[in-house]
Amino acid sequence: MADLKAHIAKVASGAALSFAEAREAFGIIMSGEATPSQIGGFLMALRVRGETVDEISGAVDTMRSKMLPVTAPAEAVDIVGTGGDASGTYNVSTCAAFIVAGCGVPVAKHGNRALSSKSGAADSLVALGVNIELGPDQIAACIAEAGVGFMFAPSHHAAMRHVGPTRVELGTRTIFNLLGPLSNPAGVKRQLVGVFSAQWVEPLAHVLRQLGTEKAWVVHGDGLDEMTTAGVTRVASLEYGEVRTFEITPEEVGLQRSAAAALKGGDGEYNGKALRRVLEGERNAYRDIAVLNAGGALIVAGKAETLKDAVALASESIESGRALAALEKLVEVSNRKP
């Protein structure tokens, strides 16, 4: 049986693991061959030294190899955040997913229940009447008919059960906070990924490049794991092997700057209602941040050349009723008897 001890010793010495070594180490962990103490020691050694692009890439490669896959169109996108930003915003990326679907771009949304906040994507979707306990064929049907399907992370990443208790006991962020958003079960090649800290914006774009992603924006918005209307958003854009970084303000795309407090959400019930009101056409700070993030995803999807044009497309998706129709269709299809 492979042993994690050699990898722990290497990381503890300050050295970095290669892609292959990281892949092996996480293979040991996700196969249940490491003890909780070994897993905890390994994760904290990585965290203290700082995870490298190769280590994250190797870990994601292992996670992808063990996941339950979903079939989605080649042009499908995901809009996902790492969580863990402690901001308590409403479910921006979930709202943006319906807006993007309303623009005719298939969305394969990967997410979970709340881990550190009051409400994760799954919590607000359940409050809206979406059935999240679906098999791969049912999710594929949701994407085909509603333009959006939701993949509930625990249903697709059973190997994570080996690390769950250790992560809870550690009570602090680890490399696993970065792996989930990069391990989409539909294997999407285009993503808008929000990260909890600006330090990860550029490295994660390089991880996605190493793993074969075609186009992605990795973003951090002034403390949020998404693009923000309350300040400046840092972006690392990956396009066919090239990574470049830049900053975005809401004003430059025609949106008003919001107070950070205006973006705060609540529990799943509250966030679900807030999301529906945005899709029904209510104009507020929730809408502005949703169309900004939808705009980023539409750029990644190749639907617009400029973010200003993409934001206009996103607004039109709401005003035409198509974004709300995508939500209502998802509720219908997800609850259909298989």
From Swiss-Prot:
Chain sites annotated for binding Mg(2+) 2: 225-226
This enzyme's EC code(s): 2.4.2.18
Positions that bind Mg(2+) 1: 93, 226
Reactions accelerated catalytically: N-(5-phospho-beta-D-ribosyl)anthranilate + diphosphate = 5-phospho-alpha-D-ribose 1-diphosphate + anthranilate
Cofactor(s) in the UniProt record: Mg(2+)
GO molecular function, one term: magnesium ion binding
Primary enzyme class: transferase
Signal sequence region: none
Keyword field contains Nucleotide-binding: no
Entry keywords, A to Z: Amino-acid biosynthesis, Aromatic amino acid biosynthesis, Glycosyltransferase, Magnesium, Metal-binding, Transferase, Tryptophan biosynthesis
Chain positions recorded as 5-phospho-alpha-D-ribose 1-diphosphate binding sites: 81, 84-85, 89, 91-94, 109-117, 121
Pfam families hit by this protein: Glycos_trans_3N, Glycos_transf_3
Keyword set includes Glycosyltransferase: yes
Alphabetical list of InterPro entries matching this protein: Anthranilate_Pribosyl_Tfrase, Glycosyl_Trfase_fam3, Glycosyl_Trfase_fam3_N_dom, Glycosyl_Trfase_fam3_N_dom_sf, Nuc_phospho_transferase
Record text on subunit structure and interactions: Homodimer.
NCBIfam families reported in the protein's UniProt record: trpD (TIGR01245)
PANTHER family registered for this protein in UniProt: ANTHRANILATE PHOSPHORIBOSYLTRANSFERASE
Annotated protein name in UniProt: Anthranilate phosphoribosyltransferase
Lineage of producing organism: Bacteria, Pseudomonadati, Pseudomonadota, Alphaproteobacteria, Hyphomicrobiales
